[in-house]
Regions:
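N-terminal targeting or regulatory segments adjacent to alpha/beta-hydrolase or S9 domains
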Residues: 1-81, 89, 94
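Active-site loop->helix "elbow" adjoining a glycine-rich segment at hydrolase catalytic centers
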Residues: 202, 234-237
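Mobile cap/lid helix-loop segments that gate and shape the active-site cleft of serine hydrolases
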Residues: 189-200, 207, 212-213, 250-292, ...
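Residue in the alpha/beta-hydrolase core beta-strand immediately N-terminal to the catalytic nucleophile
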Residues: 114, 227-229, 252
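Cap/lid segment of the alpha/beta-hydrolase catalytic domain
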Residues: 108-109, 114-208, 218-219, 264-268
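Glycine-rich active-site/cofactor-binding loop and its immediate structural neighborhood
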Residues: 74-134
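Alpha/beta-hydrolase fold nucleophile elbow
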Residues: 222-234
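Short glycine-enriched nucleophile-adjacent loop
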Residues: 237-248
């Protein structure tokens, strides 16, 4: 790095990380499960879910009519139908999505997955396989981001939403940009600044919206809710973790690139996206505690040795 001649070089810094690590070690995970029986675990599960909902800011979330609207229907090659649907997740708060519906193989209801998006993929556009958009095509090739389309090709209905701050749900800071970066990225940072002083969180809003999406699946009534799955990569994995932990209507889930320990992945790596951070969460639980609320439902986790977001211990 080129040395500037307008500053002085600091030989030693007095940062806060060591003190924060010590506080984490002293105060973290006070509500971890300490029982020994299934009955104790079931009681802990219910109490923990209520604690998590409070931490996420769900007491401020408002339910409403879903008011679903089909805005577009496109017939794709290989027989897949792509619907663009918008639902209302809170009063005057809307979630657009693509629904990929493959041809039916039999008379029974089709199996269904929520395919939740992560960062750098323009929300639903990558997950639903919009490779006709050059920037999205590059993200699909780099991250294998089109898992919604891949599910549809395997016979599953894939519901691919824009979570808050992504795609068509970007907030004002990135709405006017016509550049590729604005299109692909999200406004999680801006959402966090709006939400947290009100007692809400980005993770809480995204989890609420995913649960409302399940409401829509049930209300629509066309697909098999007895085997409802959720899958997500990176930030989509975060959403998958939370909604699966809090909503028993999720029957199976796949988390890719998001199951860490908070000390390594979000305290040491403290430059991660604002959507990861929930005030007071670390006092109560680590991420594994949240994941344990999914049991006994099936959970598959993909985690890679070279994923730098795992933290220094890999």
């Amino acid at each position: 790095m080129e040395q500037a001649d307008t500053i002085i070089q600091i030989p030693h810094f007095y940062g806060s990380l060591k003190g924060m690590q010590d506080k984490f070690d002293k105060y973290a995970r006070q509500d971890a499960f300490t029982g020994a029986t299934r009955e104790e675990w079931e009681a802990w599960k219910e109490t923990s879910r209520e604690t998590l909902k409070d931490l996420l800011g769900w007491k401020y979330m408002e339910s409403c009519d879903l008011d679903p609207r089909v805005e577009e229907v496109v017939e794709l090659e290989n027989g897949i139908r792509r619907e663009k649907v918008i639902i209302q997740v809170e009063p005057e708060v809307y979630m657009p999505m693509y629904i990929l519906i493959p041809p039916k193989q039999d008379e029974g209801k089709q199996k269904c997955f929520l395919a939740l998006p992560g960062h750098q993929g323009a929300g639903k556009f990558s997950v639903a396989g919009r490779d006709d958009i050059p920037a999205v095509k590059r993200m699909i090739e780099f991250y294998h981001y089109d898992y919604g389309m891949q599910l549809a090709k395997r016979g599953y209905v894939a519901i691919c939403p824009d979570c808050r701050g992504f795609g068509e749900r970007r907030d004002e800071a990135l709405q006017k940009g016509t550049d590729e970066k604005s299109f692909l990225t999200s406004t999680c940072f801006h959402l966090a600044h709006m939400a947290e002083p009100l007692g809400e969180t980005v993770a809480g809003m995204c989890t609420w919206d995913a649960s409302r999406l399940i409401d829509y699946v049930y209300e629509r009534g066309e697909w098999d809710t007895d085997d409802l799955g959720v899958v997500g990569f990176s930030g989509g994995g975060m959403q998958t973790l939370w909604v699966s932990a809090l909503d028993d209507r999720v029957k199976k889930c796949i988390i890719s690139g998001y199951l860490y320990g908070y000390r390594d992945a979000l305290l040491l790596l403290n430059g991660n996206c604002s959507c990861n951070y929930v005030p007071h969460l670390w006092e109560h639980f680590d991420m594994g505690d949240i994941a344990s609320l999914i049991a006994p439902r099936p959970l598959a986790v993909q985690s890679c040795r070279d994923d730098h977001l795992n933290g220094p211990r890999g």
